[in-house]
Swiss-Prot record:
Keyword Protease belongs to the record: no
Keyword Transmembrane helix: yes
Extracellular compartment segments: 24-60
Protein name: Uncharacterized protein C11orf87 homolog
GO cellular component, as recorded: membrane
Organism annotation: Mus musculus (Mouse)
Lineage: Eukaryota, Metazoa, Chordata, Craniata, Vertebrata
Length: 199
């Protein structure tokens, strides 16, 4: 263990410092020329140590700068991705809202048109009923005329004494045309019965 420690120290220290320490251990004293040479060697050794320290520090600085740049690039890429994703979500939401509003407006317009058609339909039905009533009355009048003519022809000898009876009143207007037609068809039968009784 003791032998390995000096080896590690020798590897860590620059060669000028190693030579100086080795010379100091070997020779305890020396001439003035040797001291001058050692002083000059000491100055050059300091510059060498400074250069080594600067190189090591610069290399560490370069590594730190590279790591920070990589980290910043990752952060920027992630932030841009999230921002773009949020914008896309907002656009999708806006488009969905616009489509929903369009569908709702078109449905409201279509629903408004249907009740109008339903309101107009009953009026058309009323008009058709009103048109049917005059036709039914027109069909009724010839039957009354035929009944009066048949009564006069069947009993030519009999004359009306006093004022003649008024004609039967017209049936009340009904909402449907079928009952009115049936009532009109029943009137000639009644006239025939009256003529038979008179004869």
């Amino acid at each position: 263990m003791s032998a390995r420690a000096p080896k590690e120290l020798r590897l860590a220290l620059p060669p000028c410092l190693l030579n100086r320490t080795f010379a100091s251990h070997n020779a305890s004293g020396g001439s003035s020329a040797g001291l001058r040479s050692s002083g000059a060697g000491g100055g050059t050794c300091i510059t060498q140590v400074g250069q080594q320290l600067f190189q090591s520090f610069s290399s560490t600085l370069v590594l730190i700068v590279l790591v920070t740049l990589i980290f910043c690039l990752l952060v920027l890429s992630l932030s841009t991705f999230h921002i773009h994703k949020r914008r896309m979500k907002k656009r999708k939401m806006q488009r969905a809202q616009e489509e929903y509003e369009r569908d709702h407006c078109s449905g409201s317009h279509g629903g408004g048109g249907l009740p109008r058609a339903g309101v107009q339909a009953p009026t058309h039905g009323k008009e058709t009923r009103l048109e049917r009533q005059p036709r039914d009355s027109a069909f009724c009048t010839p039957s009354n005329a035929t009944s009066s003519s048949s009564s006069s022809s069947s009993s030519p000898g009999l004359l009306c004494q006093g004022p003649c009876a008024p004609p039967p009143p017209l049936p009340a207007p009904t909402p449907q045309g079928a009952p009115a037609a049936s009532s009109c068809l029943d009137t000639p039968g009644e006239g025939l019965l009256q003529t038979v009784v008179l004869s």
